[in-house]
Amino acid sequence: MSGIHHVTAIAGNPLRNFAFYTRDLGLRFVKKTVNFDDPGTYHFYYGDETGRPGTILTFFPWEGAPAGRRGVGETEETAFRVPQGSLSYWAQRLQDKGIKFETPEKRFGEPVLTFIDPDGMALALVGVAGADGESAWSNGDIPAEHAIRGFHGVTLLLADATKTAKVLTDIFGLREIAREGSLIRFAAAGEKEGGLVNLREVKGLARGGQGRGSVHHIAFRAKDDAEQALMAEKLVGNHGLHATEQKDRNYFRSVYFREPGGVLFEIATDIPGFAVDEPVATLGRDLKLPRFLEPHRSEIESVLPELQGA
């Protein structure tokens, strides 16, 4: 098991975030819950029909949060997969929605359309050969043949990529497959959604600062608790890096560590998944709370902003 489990980022206004990712990009709203460590803040999960690992983008919407600052030790870009012939559809859709985008370019032989979300998070759509044969969630507005197929991958901006590369290969089983300009590409064997990580090494750039539009952390997959524990042991033994104690996030179990380049990484289990507390048919409809917060539901609901239409 390898590749990206989910990406968690910081947003500003929650309703604006919801509208952009569900209506403009057509992702499914998989879960409406709260930040377990800060229950006065929502935690939104977007993904495919069931929220499979490799499709999940999550947000902490902090109204009034200052903008993040680009720099090393941060995620530079989060990219989604779409069918290779769908970029013209997406360029037209973004234009119709008033979303600015850059002229399409090619990276590693694939067409790429780059743009930013309402909070300044750098995003890309990558046309992938063969993706048209993969299943996709459709919101009824975006035709299934053009819909997003989960993550393509992420690009990390680093002052020195050497030690980060060793963590990717030794702990997560990725392998270096290509280099292009300042980018080094790593791939997870056999994985489609979320199978790629690019490292961009830049000398002399100041360290980034987290805020609105920043990625908070990147989570990588572990099949279960046992595989997660083995990864954590290897982190200490092979790299001198210590993960946190395991935290139960209800839909997966997590440990966290900061990789040598400064990016916060998580190792998240594939189990139990998002249908553990509501049926697949109604995912994202109701506010779901973990058992330890359920006694405080009325208090929590009173401080959360209203989400009409979410």
Predicted ranges, named:
Residues 145-232, 236-242, 259:
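Surface-exposed interaction/gating patches
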Residues 10-53, 96, 104-114, 156-200, ...:
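Core segments of cupin and vicinal oxygen chelate
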Residues 65-67, 132-139, 202-207:
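A short, acidic/glycine-rich surface segment
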Residues 31-36, 46-80:
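Conserved donor-binding loop and adjoining core beta-sheet/short helix segment
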Residues 1-16, 75-82, 130-165, 211-221, ...:
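N-terminal beta-strand motif that seeds the catalytic metal site of vicinal oxygen chelate
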Residues 13, 48, 82-84, 117, ...:
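Non-catalytic surface loops within mature trypsin-like serine protease
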Residues 2-12, 33, 63-159, 179-198, 233, ...:
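Vicinal oxygen chelate
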